[in-house]
Curated annotation (Swiss-Prot):
Organism: Salmonella typhimurium (strain LT2 / SGSC1412 / ATCC 700720)
Region ranges (Disordered): 23-47
GO biological process: one example: translation
Name of the gene encoding the protein in the UniProt record: sra
Record field: transmembrane: none
InterPro entries for this protein: SRA-like
Protein name (record): Stationary-phase-induced ribosome-associated protein
Known role: Although this protein associates with the 30S subunit of the ribosome it is not considered to be a bona fide ribosomal protein.
């Protein structure tokens, strides 16, 4: 993975934060989009 570290950083997939957030680049503006994973433990999500 060390050899692919720079490419992942360009794609906004830095290995430290790739699970939590994603960087979306459109034109010259970049925005960080939260990408929640795992169990959603909110009480209102129970059915």
């Amino acid at each position: 993975m060390k050899s692919n570290r720079q490419a992942r950083h360009i794609l906004g997939l830095d290995y430290r934060i790739s699970n939590q957030r994603k960087v979306v680049t459109e034109g010259d503006t970049s925005s960080v989009v939260n990408n929640p994973t795992g169990r959603k433990r909110r009480a209102d999500s129970q059915k």
